[in-house]
């Protein structure tokens, strides 16, 4: 061990231990191991008690609270997912019903328009048939009138031709028969 020597001022000088070596680092001194181990054991027991009685319950309660919050959030998410699935099913059902209604309305409108256009077409066909019959009657009457005028014109022309060529006035009855025969042949 080191010995101290006092000087005139009362200061103590430290000298090297026997053998001229310095004193070893105190934790590594063999004669203090037992007290150091007891101090270390007391420190670890105190640390263990503090950690196990104060810190670990707080950490455990925080972890339990966090796990409970996660469980609650997961349950809420599952509930909301179920609600959204139900809402989606209801939406899809409503959408399918709306499509069916739209198709039914479209089909009904199409049928109604087809029926209206068919009725209009039939009405127009009937009106056209009536107008066609009237036109045919008018044409027949006009033709009859024209043919009666043609007969007179043809008889006058034939009489003029016969008189011009032969210089004789033709007999009216013979001329009428010849014109009638010629007109009947052209109509056939």
UniProtKB/Swiss-Prot annotation:
Region (Disordered): 1-23
Intracellular or extracellular location(s): Cell inner membrane
Highest taxon listed in the record's lineage: Bacteria
Gene3D superfamilies attached to this UniProt entry: 6.10.250.1580
InterPro entries named in the record: ATP_synth_b/b'su_bac/chlpt, ATP_synthase_B_chain
Family from the record: Belongs to the ATPase B chain family.
Cited function: F(1)F(0) ATP synthase produces ATP from ADP in the presence of a proton or sodium gradient. F-type ATPases consist of two structural domains, F(1) containing the extramembraneous catalytic core and F(0) containing the membrane proton channel, linked together by a central stalk and a peripheral stalk. During catalysis, ATP synthesis in the catalytic domain of F(1) is coupled via a rotary mechanism of the central stalk subunits to proton translocation.
Record's protein name: ATP synthase subunit b 2
Originating organism: Rhodopseudomonas palustris (strain BisB18)
Taxon lineage: Bacteria, Pseudomonadati, Pseudomonadota, Alphaproteobacteria, Hyphomicrobiales
């Amino acid at each position: 061990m080191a010995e101290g020597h006092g000087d005139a001022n009362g200061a103590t000088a430290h000298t090297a231990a026997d053998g001229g070596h310095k004193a070893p680092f105190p934790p590594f001194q063999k004669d203090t191991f037992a007290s150091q181990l007891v101090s270390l054991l007391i420190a670890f027991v105190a640390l263990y008690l503090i950690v196990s009685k104060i810190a670990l319950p707080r950490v455990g309660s925080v972890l339990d609270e966090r796990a409970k919050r996660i469980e609650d959030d997961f349950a809420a998410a599952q509930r909301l997912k179920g609600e959204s699935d139900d809402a989606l099913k209801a939406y899809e059902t409503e959408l399918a019903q709306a499509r069916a209604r739209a198709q039914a309305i479209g089909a009904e409108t199409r049928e109604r328009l087809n029926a209206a256009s068919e009725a209009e077409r039939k009405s127009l066909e009937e009106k056209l048939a009536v107008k066609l019959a009237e036109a045919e009657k008018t044409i027949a009457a006009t033709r009859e009138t024209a043919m009666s005028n043609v007969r007179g014109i043809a008889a006058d022309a034939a009489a003029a031709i016969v008189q011009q060529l032969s210089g004789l006035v033709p007999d009216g009855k013979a001329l009428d028969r010849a014109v009638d025969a010629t007109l009947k042949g052209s109509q056939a």
